[in-house]
Amino acid sequence: MSGNNESASYASSLARLDTYYREKVVPALMERFQYKNIMEVPRLQKIAINIGVGDAAGEPKLLDVAVGELTQIAGQKPQIRKSKKAISNFKLREGQAIGCRVTLRRKAMYEFFDRFVSLAVPRIRDFRGLSDTSFDGRGNYTAGVKEQIIFPEIDIDKVPRISGMDISFVTSAKSDEEAYVLLSELGMPFKKKNN
């Protein structure tokens, strides 16, 4: 009897997309790529969100705003990123704060992915699908977002300036094709390929 309660509490602790991945995506990928073992099936490992604030040198408050917005979007506090070397043309000193990033894993990762695909992406102006050319050759995908206001967590009236971000989806896929199929099965709205 207690085993049934444990499995029920485990299932309720999973994100909706994680359950969908296990029940629908894994069998579809096993059939498509003829995997012999379920452990060969690629999975989403982490999502890294990065906001660069180039004007943080002149206006330090912009970095605080970016940290606050990224905290609202991701649900966890981001790391402050500092410059590695000085570049005089950009008026940049070594060790100066220039951005922030956050890495999401497990439940938080699946919940963010679900919100990104179902709530944020449809709010992009003139959206015709995400580019399928942003794969890195190792099965990872990076999407550039030009406006942080596509996320429903951000209050448009309180945004001092529009800023963008990079969102990297790191998978265990061995090739870009496997990663493309994995992300497509999870609901990533790529542009339609012209075959």
From Swiss-Prot:
Transmembrane domains' residue ranges: none
* UniProt-listed InterPro entries: Ribosomal_uL5 (IPR002132), Ribosomal_uL5_bac-type (IPR020930), Ribosomal_uL5_C (IPR031309), Ribosomal_uL5_dom_sf (IPR022803), Ribosomal_uL5_N (IPR031310)
- SUPFAM superfamilies given for it? RL5-like (SSF55282)
A single GO CC term for this protein reads:
ribosome
Q: Note the Pfam families from the entry.
A: Ribosomal_L5, Ribosomal_L5_C
Which GO terms label this protein's molecular function in UniProt?
A: rRNA binding; structural constituent of ribosome; tRNA binding
Swiss-Prot/TrEMBL keywords: Ribonucleoprotein, Ribosomal protein, RNA-binding, rRNA-binding, tRNA-binding
Q: Which GO terms describe its biological process?
A: translation
Record family assignment: Belongs to the universal ribosomal protein uL5 family.
Its job:
This is one of the proteins that bind and probably mediate the attachment of the 5S RNA into the large ribosomal subunit, where it forms part of the central protuberance. In the 70S ribosome it contacts protein S13 of the 30S subunit (bridge B1b), connecting the 2 subunits; this bridge is implicated in subunit movement. Contacts the P site tRNA; the 5S rRNA and some of its associated proteins might help stabilize positioning of ribosome-bound tRNAs.
Q: Which NCBIfam families match?
A: PRK00010.1
Partners and quaternary state? Part of the 50S ribosomal subunit; part of the 5S rRNA/L5/L18/L25 subcomplex. Contacts the 5S rRNA and the P site tRNA. Forms a bridge to the 30S subunit in the 70S ribosome.
State the name under which the record lists this protein.
Large ribosomal subunit protein uL5
